[in-house]
Amino acid sequence: MKEYGETIFDICYLLIAIVIGIYLLAKGKNKQGKLMGIATLVLGLGDSFHLVPRMLDYFVDADFTAPLGIGKLITSITMTMFYIFMYYIYKENYKVEDNKIIKISIWLLAVIRIALCLLPQNKWFTNDGSVTIGIIRNIPFVIMGAIIIYLYFINRRKDKTFKNMWIYILLSFLFYIPVVVGASSIPMLGMFMLPKTICYILIIVLFKKKKTNELAD
């Protein structure tokens, strides 16, 4: 029964992300609109690489270890890209001047994160990488996320639509960290990925709301 529930939820999430992403991209007449569309598609399509093999693994009698591992690798990279887009969406939305230190930090952390994800020690293809390497590759990602959370937090009163954006990003990381640290020894912690995904859906809804408000003006 758990498999059916998870599969239905994952399909709904992917459809929401891809459909709204296409909508935002099609309706995006300014830079921010296009950035929100691309970010949403990167999120949805990136997650599909590990969610689709996981769904198939529930119902097809075959070994999906390698596809699941490759999917997790791709998702790790696309999630990093998503937060790069979140930085540029922040810049466009709040009309802030370029802060070179923050910009360089975001890009440097993203490059380090992706480089760590590509290390053979991750053993993506056999799905038996250590918890230690999992924690190490996520350190720059969490720092990157903390910067994005801070930026949206300090500007939360400047935009009614995005006022809760920092909360959704913060919660997504709070649900994600226990999975990285303890899911290999306590599989039940993997259930935290469900509320993490709900946070992503809420972020996508804010993008959609922002675009709807712009079109109404």
Indicate where each model-derived feature is located.
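Membrane-interface helix-boundary motifs at transmembrane edges
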Residues: 25-36, 91-102, 127-129, 153-164, ...
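Membrane-helix boundary elements
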Residues: 108-133, 152-155
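Hydrophobic transmembrane alpha-helical segments in integral membrane proteins
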Residues: 1-18
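Non-cytosolic membrane-interface motifs at loop->transmembrane helix junctions
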Residues: 3-6, 62-74, 126-138, 186-196
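Internal transmembrane alpha-helix with an interfacial aromatic "cap," most often the third helix
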Residues: 21-25, 51-64, 70-104, 117, ...
